[in-house]
Amino acid sequence: ERELTLMLVVDVSGSGLFGSRGQSKRELAAEIASVLAFSAIRNNDKVGLILFSDEVEKFIPPRKGRSHVLRVIREVLFFEPKRRGTDLNAALEFLLRVQAHKAVAVVVSDFLGSPAQAKNEARRHVRPQMMLLESLAQASFTRLKQTNRRHDVVAVQITDRYELELPPLGRLVLRDAETGEVVEVHTGDARKREAFATRQAKTLAETARIFRSAGIDAIQLRTDEPYGAALGKFFEAREKRRLRG
C-alpha cells in the first residue's frame, strides 16, 4: 500500500485578501487546500502544513488521521498572519530543513509580488492593489529547482480577474494589501487598461515558463472561475504520467 506525504505550503500574505467577485484568493486557496487534504486522507497519506507570508507563520508536521486533517483545514481557513509581505524563498528553505523524506509539496499562492523595481513602470500605467505584478517564481527560481530535486513540487497559482484586467470604473483610490501604499488610478483610459492587461498576461506567461524550466507541474486558477474540473484533470494527468514512469 502506498504512503505519501502531502505538504501544503500556503501563502497567507496580504495580497490573498484581494477578491473582486465575492471570494478572495485566500478563501479559494483554503478551499483547494481542503480538497487536497481530504483526498490525501482517503489515500491513507500524511498531511502537513506550512503557512507563510514573508516568514513562516505556522508549521504543522505531517501526520495521518481525520482529526489531524481537520486541524490543518481549520488553520488554513482561520489563521491570522502576523505579517503581510511575501517571501517564497523563506517557505521553501523551511520546507527543505524540516522535511527530510520526499514529499508532494503543493504550493498554493498567487506567486505575484510588487517589488520596488516595478514602481516606476507601474505609475506609467495603472495597477490593482495597485502595483504591476511581478513573478515571485522568478525571484525564487533557484530555490524552486533545489526544492523540486528533493520533493515533488506542484504549484497552484491563484489570481483574480481584476489583477489581470481593470474594469472601466473611472478614478479609484486603492491600497496595496502588502505594503499599505495608497494610490489613485484612472481606469477610464482604454489604452492604459489594454497596456495593463498585456503586461499582466506576460507576467503570468513568464511565471508558467519558469515553472516548466524548473520541472514543476503548475496550474493557474482564478477566483471568478470554477476550479473543480480543471483541478481534477490536472492531478489526473499527473497521475497518468507517474504511472507511465
Roles of regions detected by a PLM:
Residues 32, 68, 72, 91, ...:
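Internal, well-ordered alpha-helical segments in soluble enzyme and binding-protein domains
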Residues 57-86, 185:
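Short, charged loop segments at secondary-structure junctions
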Residues 94-103, 115-245:
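Von Willebrand factor type A / integrin I
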Residues 27, 82-89, 127, 198-201:
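Conserved phosphate-coordination/catalytic loops
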Residues 31, 35, 86-93, 205, ...:
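Short, contiguous clusters of charged residues that form electrostatic/catalytic patches at enzyme active sites
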Residues 1-5, 15-21, 77-105, 114, ...:
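A structural preference for long, well-packed, hydrophobic secondary-structure segments
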Residues 1-63, 104-109, 115, 131-135, ...:
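An amphipathic, basic-hydrophobic helix/alpha-beta surface used to engage anionic
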Residues 31-38, 74-77, 93-97:
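A broadly conserved amphipathic alpha-helix scaffold signal in soluble, globular proteins
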